[in-house]
Each structure stands twice: as C-alpha cells, then as structure tokens.
Amino acid sequence: MARARGVVLGYRRGTNTQYPQHALVKLLLDDPRKAGLYVSGIAFYRDRYGNVYKGRVLRLHGRRGGVVVVKFNPPLPGQATGGVVEVVKAGGDG
C-alpha cells in the first residue's frame, strides 16, 4: 500500500460559505502531478489528544500543486490547520 504525508491547508471555501467537513490537503510528494493516484484513498489525522479523524480523498483541487480535497467525518477542528495527515492509497499494489 502506498502512503503519503500531507499538510492541512484549511477548509474548502466559497465566497460566502465555508465547508468544515472538506479539508484541503497538500500532499508532500516528489512529483505533485501524482496526487491524482490518491483519489478515493483514506486519510487519517491524529490530534495531540490522541483523537483520530478519518476521511476520504474526494478529488484534486487545481491542476497542479498536489492539493486534494478530503472529506472528514467528523469534521476536522480549526486547530488542525497546518497539521500532518497520513494518506493511504486505495486499491491494490498500484
């Protein structure tokens, strides 16, 4: 199973709306264009109290740069911004 680490950039936002259940995560990859391989993968965030937040990678955010949209349930707290996320690629060996 391929794993990648990422950094939480913040919530997905519109002009007047914020979507706290959707987090933008920048994957720390050698080639940012490979971020698409992690779509439908599972993401984990652990806070300093030991709580684990689990989410699914929904789609890419932008054309390049390695940013993906992850839907967490329950939503990430605001303090997670800048925190580290572990992403596991879905599927087989790939």
UniProtKB/Swiss-Prot annotation:
Alphabetized UniProt keyword annotations: Ribonucleoprotein, Ribosomal protein
GO molecular function: structural constituent of ribosome
Positions of disulphide bridges: none
GO biological processes: translation
Cellular-component GO terms for this entry: ribonucleoprotein complex; ribosome
Entry keyword Acyltransferase: no
SUPFAM superfamilies for the chain: Translation proteins
Family: Belongs to the eukaryotic ribosomal protein eL33 family.
Listed name of the protein: Large ribosomal subunit protein eL33
Highest classification ranks of the organism: Archaea, Thermoproteota, Thermoprotei, Desulfurococcales, Desulfurococcaceae
Gene: rpl35ae
